[in-house]
Amino acid sequence: MKKHPLILCAGITSLLLSACNPVKVPEAILPVPEAKQVEWQKMETYAFVHFGLNTFNDREWGYGDSDPKTFNPAKLDCEQWVKTFVESGMKGVILTAKHHDGFCLWPTQLTEYCIRNTPYKNGQGDIVRELSDACKKYGIKFAVYLSPWDRHQANYGTPEYVD
């Protein structure tokens, strides 16, 4: 009588152990993302900040003809932006550092059409640096968008511009 439960347990154990054999992973049919692509997808939500001359000139698109002196975000607080992004669950920030109008939010030497020629911090401001520093402080990623299109460029709209 005691042999029945023992045989039953042995049978069940052998069935369970046979189910534990390694399963062959199927071959990938489509391209498999690289590890860095998977990490990018895990980032999920970013803030995309479009802030520049248009903000102060009531324009959706700039034509590269707005006076830089109209740009003066005297109460700008990049840390406040980043705190808000973090509280909203954002994993990073992308700043439009130069849009199609050609205006640069950092003091570049490559064009006069930049923050260096504004009243903001007496021409000493650098919003790219300020936002980057705030992102580091609060532990989120930072990136910039630079438009390759530059409507402020003198030869814009000519064949030379395209070359």
Regions found by a protein language model. Name each.
Residues 21-163:
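Mature catalytic domains of secreted/periplasmic carbohydrate-active enzymes
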